[in-house]
């Protein structure tokens, strides 16, 4: 097959320019960002907004020219029942098939991270929330010690999102403008109690924990605080990379 000659421009053949090869990237010399962050907190603490913000923040997942599907998972997903606001890995019915399924979900997600450790993982509520709910709703104590050992081996960090006293009412008013299930915000004392319980349970965890006051809602500043903390702990990068540097 013959090549089509270049078009004539002003009576002269058009000049074919050689493609310029881009300069070799220096990214290969920079440690890969592989943070693994569990966001815990009661409702109205902006944890889900923060999860999405962290999952796109350049200091957490690296600079990007376009949106990318970094993993973001949540134990709040109510996938055990065929209706909205049903049950899932946090609020399962204890002592039977649902509890076994919930524990299998936690095990499966941790195994997934173990199989792909050199990547970022953002988790919106996980095992600490399950402990809190089961204690509150059923006086049922869950033992996640083995799970936490695996999470610690993966260098998973916990960010406990909290809200200052005196701001719950305003936060509820803001949420009710968009909520599809407003009755869940009737009892603000429940959220206050759950926040204290989550504080206690996070204090019992063997994982690194940062308590983060999210009241003011400046997501970029909050992401910066998380990035500063994880940079100080070394949790942003693979341990092999930080130990070799």
Annotate each language-model stretch with its function.
Residues 39:
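Hydrophobic anchor at the beta1->P-loop junction of P-loop NTPases
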Residues 45, 52-114, 133-135:
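Conserved substrate/cofactor phosphate-moiety recognition/catalytic segment
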Residues 140-141, 148-200:
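A glycine- and Lys/Arg-enriched "phosphate-lid" helix/loop adjacent to the NTP-binding pocket
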Residues 99-109, 137-147, 184-196, 223-227:
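Well-ordered, non-membrane alpha-helical segments in soluble/globular domains
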Residues 196-245:
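NTP-dependent small-molecule kinase module
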Residues 9-24:
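N-terminal pre-Walker A segment at the start of P-loop NTPase domains
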């Amino acid at each position: 097959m013959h090549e089509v000659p270049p078009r004539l421009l002003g009576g002269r053949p058009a000049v074919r320019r050689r493609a310029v090869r881009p300069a070799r990237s220096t990214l290969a010399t920079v440690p890969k960002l592989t943070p693994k962050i569990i966001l815990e907190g009661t409702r109205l603490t902006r944890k889900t907004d923060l999860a999405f913000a962290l999952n796109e923040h350049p200091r957490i997942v690296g600079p990007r020219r376009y949106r990318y599907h970094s993993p973001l998972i949540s134990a709040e997903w109510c996938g055990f029942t065929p209706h909205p606001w049903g049950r899932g890995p946090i609020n399962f019915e204890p002592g039977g098939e649902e509890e076994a399924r919930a524990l299998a979900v936690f095990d499966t997600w941790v195994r997934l991270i173990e199989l792909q450790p050199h990547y970022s993982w953002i988790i919106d509520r996980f095992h600490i929330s399950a402990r809190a709910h089961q204690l509150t709703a059923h006086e049922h104590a869950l033992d996640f010690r083995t799970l936490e050992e695996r999470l610690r081996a993966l260098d998973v960090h916990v960010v406990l999102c909290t809200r200052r006293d005196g701001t719950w009412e305003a936060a509820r008013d803001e949420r009710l403008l968009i909520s599809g299930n407003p009755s869940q915000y009737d009892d603000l004392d429940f959220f206050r109690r759950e926040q204290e319980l989550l504080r206690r349970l996070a204090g019992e965890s063997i994982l690194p924990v940062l308590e983060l006051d999210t009241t003011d809602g400046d997501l970029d500043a909050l992401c910066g605080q998380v990035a500063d903390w994880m940079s100080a702990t070394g949790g942003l990068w693979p341990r092999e990379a930080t130990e070799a540097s």
